[in-house]
């Protein structure tokens, strides 16, 4: 006697597949963004605009003299570092007329003071000088614009670029990292957080 064989036709196979149903253990990747690290304020895309420069010196000597040149460029140096406009002025405990001069100067950025140690060498028409500051200006407007630009370049989700609410509108800090952070949410839903740092050449964002 030949063995009895049963052939499962296509319709029966389809029915069995339908009865098995979907795999309930599989889960789709979540598109929900991660929660921000803390309450913050949305940053603005508005450029703080860089000031053309300090007001023309009135009590720094004749224009083009070494003293007037240094006075003006000290202010411009602080404006460039801050990345934001302000009313500036500068005072020094010595005048830069001739010879080797070491002076202590203070640049006022609105109501903020940026002290500097200035060294100059002046001979005839030749002038070399340098200025060293230990603090820099943090401007919330500039920080916000820079962070928004980074978020846009990194394809962050719209409306997620934020910085600490406690960050002041303007303040001076020693060069290096500050207590403040900024963050945004990536297209994949993860949060990128960086620490705000004040540098001699401007604001940077460091790994938190």
How would you name each of these model-derived features?
Residues 1-8:
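Bacterial N-terminal signal peptides that target proteins for export
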Residues 9-10, 20-41:
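Short, low-complexity, disordered segments immediately C-terminal to signal peptides
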Residues 15-18:
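C-terminal motif of bacterial Sec signal peptides marking the signal peptidase cleavage site
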Residues 39-73, 130-131:
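N-terminal presequence-like segments and adjacent domain-start helices
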Residues 57-89, 137-166:
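Short, non-transmembrane alpha-helical segments in secretory-pathway proteins
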Residues 86-104, 163-179:
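Serine/threonine-rich, repeat-prone extracellular segments and beta-strand-based repeat modules
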Residues 125-141, 202-208:
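A short, surface-exposed interaction/processing loop segment used at functional sites
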Residues 149-208:
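Extracellularly exposed regions in secreted/surface proteins, prominently low-complexity, repeat-rich
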């Amino acid at each position: 006697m030949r063995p009895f064989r049963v052939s499962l036709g296509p319709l029966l196979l389809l029915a069995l597949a339908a009865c098995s149903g979907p795999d309930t253990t599989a889960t789709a990747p979540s598109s929900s963004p991660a929660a921000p690290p803390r309450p913050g304020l949305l940053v603005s895309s508005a450029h703080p605009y860089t000031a053309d420069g300090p007001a023309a010196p009135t009590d720094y000597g004749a224009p083009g003299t070494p003293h007037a040149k240094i006075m003006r460029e000290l202010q411009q140096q602080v404006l460039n570092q801050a990345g934001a406009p302000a009313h500036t002025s500068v005072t020094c405990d010595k005048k830069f007329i001739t010879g080797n001069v070491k002076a202590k100067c203070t640049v006022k950025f609105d109501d903020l003071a940026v002290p500097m140690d200035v060294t100059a060498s002046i001979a005839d028409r030749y002038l070399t000088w340098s200025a060293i500051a230990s603090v820099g200006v943090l401007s919330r407007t500039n920080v916000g614009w820079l962070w928004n630009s980074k978020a846009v370049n990194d394809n962050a989700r719209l409306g997620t670029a934020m910085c600490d609410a406690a960050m002041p509108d303007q303040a001076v800090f020693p060069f290096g990292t500050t207590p403040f952070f900024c963050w945004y949410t990536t297209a994949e839903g993860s949060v990128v957080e960086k620490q705000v740092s004040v540098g001699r050449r401007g604001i940077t964002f460091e790994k938190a």
